[in-house]
Curated annotation (Swiss-Prot):
Record CDD domains: F1-ATPase_delta (cd12152)
Organism this protein belongs to: Lacticaseibacillus paracasei (strain ATCC 334 / BCRC 17002 / CCUG 31169 / CIP 107868 / KCTC 3260 / NRRL B-441)
Protein name, per record: ATP synthase epsilon chain
Major subcellular location class: membrane
Compartment(s) of residence: Cell membrane
Gene: atpC
Family that this chain belongs to: Belongs to the ATPase epsilon chain family.
Length: 143
């Protein structure tokens, strides 16, 4: 493994517990301000996250990347630790594509129904559900 001062520890936590905990060369997240690349020795920050893919360039024998579908939350970076707290997060290898596609289809139907009913609350909830489903599909199919 690389020298610890050049390594970033990445952990992702949801209400269900720890989803991810590895050392990385680089972490890429989608914050509300745009895409952020985080490396070791980064200045301390706290930022809210968008629904999107988190890409981790791991530090190990194979130097591979891990992709995690994260549904919002926030990230804190301090002392070579990047901690992401999210409502939900799912590693690419754990995403069930057929379930994600079914969730997308349900959300699209809910959007159509909410528009027909002129129900703005249901429309917003269905749009978020659609973004989450599409995020999971994109993470699963892009690797």
């Amino acid at each position: 493994m690389a020298e610890t001062s050049n390594v970033l520890r990445v952990n992702i936590v949801t209400p269900d517990g720890l989803v991810y905990d590895h050392h990385a060369r680089m972490l890429v997240v989608h914050s509300v301000a745009g895409e952020l690349g985080i490396m070791a020795n980064h200045e301390p920050i706290v930022t809210p996250l968008e629904i999107g893919e988190v890409d981790v360039q791991r530090v190990d024998a194979s130097d591979h990347n891990d992709s995690i579908a994260v549904n919002g939350g926030f990230m804190e970076v301090s002392e070579n630790v990047a901690s992401i707290v999210a409502d939900s997060a799912e590693r690419e290898r754990d995403i069930d594509l057929s379930r994600a596609q079914a969730a997308r289809d349900r959300a699209q139907k809910r959007i159509a129904q909410a528009k027909n009913d002129h129900n703005q609350d249901d429309l917003r909830r269905a749009q978020v559900a659609l973004r989450r489903a599409i995020n999971r599909i994109n993470v699963k199919t892009s690797h």
